[in-house]
Amino acid sequence: MRDQYAGDVSDVLKFAFLRALAGKDRTLGIAWYYAPGDDGRSDGRHLEWRDETAWRVLDEELHTGLAALPERSVAALERAMIWPEAALFHREPMPPRAGRSAWGIRKRSALDSADIVFLDPENGIGEETEKHATFSEIRLLRKPGRAIVFITFPGRSMKHDALLQQLHERLAVETDAENIITLRTNVSVPAAERPRSYVQRQRWFTFIDPDAELIARARAFASNLTCIPRVRAVLDGIA
C-alpha cells in the first residue's frame, strides 16, 4: 500500500467489505505492507465514488469518513473515523529481504488480538518482494478463531476460473487451510484518455479460515455490491 492510493475507489470497496465482515463483534487488524513514496504511476486517481449516491448508500459512515480525508496517506486513513472499535494497524515500511523475517514477527505481534487480519500488499501474493505478501507470512499469522483476508489482482495469464482454482489449491498446500473462499469484484472506472469510456478494475479478496458467520456476511456484502452501477461481485469457493 502506498500513500498515493489512499481514498481511491479500491479503498472504498475493501474498507466497506472489512467493515461488513467485522460488524460489532470482531476485532480488525490491518497489515498495510506499507511502501513509502510515490512510484510515479497514475494508480489511485479514481475518486468518482465521492459523487455517486450508490457508494454512499453502501456504507454512509465510510463514505463520509473517506471523503473528509485531510490528505492522501496511510497515516490519515488510520486516523479516519471509519474503523470498527479497537482496530489494529501495522504500518512499518516493507524492509529489505534480509530483514523481512523479523519484520513479519513484529507484524504478528502488533496484530495479535485481531480476529480478522487483512493483508494489503501492492501486488497480492507472490515472491518475497516489497510488492507482495507471501504464503509463509500467511502461515505465520494463522491461529484458531482468526480469519485472514488478502487482496489479489488477477492477471491475464489464464482464464480467471482456472486462476482462482490454482490460487485456492496453492493456498491449501502452502497454509494447510481447509476453508478458503474468494470474493471476486469488478469495478468499471473512467478511462484516463477517454473519460466517457470505462475500463475494468478487478480485485479479489480471498479468505482463509472464515467461519459460517463471516461467510454469511460476505455473501450479504456481495449482494449489496450488485446494486452499485458498473460493479459486479461473486463469492466463490463455498462448499
Which sequence ranges carry the predicted segments?
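Class I S-adenosyl-L-methionine-dependent methyltransferase catalytic core
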Residues: M1-A239
